[in-house]
């Protein structure tokens, strides 16, 4: 995978101005964008990135697996995937949450749990469902 520095944000921190200026020049020479953050902010932005990127990608992978195992083209999910990401960028995700967990739709939740055969996936579904429900109490 190629890294295009003009497409990512680089977070920099230094103990003195000279080092900070050197870091800025390096990022600019790579045609990158930088933001100065302290150590706590950098740790928290990394945590946020894991939720937004790694965990979301994992969920997409699980959804794709369900499609493939059931002879459903994953391309059918592309519109909802694009819509979800675009709305999350442009609006408050807390105001956009939909689905059986928010509605407390026990019939659909039960159906989904019956469809999930893997014990760990079932636990993950239950944990995420509870997290969504708790967020909207």
What is each model feature region?
Residues 1-89, 120, 127-132:
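Internal alpha-helical scaffold of NAD(P)-dependent oxidoreductase catalytic cores
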Residues 93-137:
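C-terminal active-site/capping subdomain that shapes the small-molecule cofactor and substrate pocket
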């Amino acid at each position: 995978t190629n890294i295009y520095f003009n497409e990512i944000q680089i977070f920099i921190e230094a103990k003195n101005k000279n080092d900070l200026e050197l870091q800025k020049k390096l990022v600019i020479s790579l045609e990158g964008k930088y933001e100065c953050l302290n150590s706590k902010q950098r740790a928290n932005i990394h945590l946020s990135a894991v939720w937004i990127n790694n965990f979301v990608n994992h969920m997409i992978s699980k959804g794709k697996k369900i499609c493939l195992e059931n002879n459903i083209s994953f391309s059918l999910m592309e519109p909802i995937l694009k819509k979800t990401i675009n709305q999350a960028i442009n609006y408050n995700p807390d105001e956009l949450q939909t689905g059986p967990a928010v509605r407390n739709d026990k019939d659909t939740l039960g159906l989904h749990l019956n469809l999930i055969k893997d014990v760990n996936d079932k636990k993950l579904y239950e944990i995420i469902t509870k997290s969504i429900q708790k967020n909207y109490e």
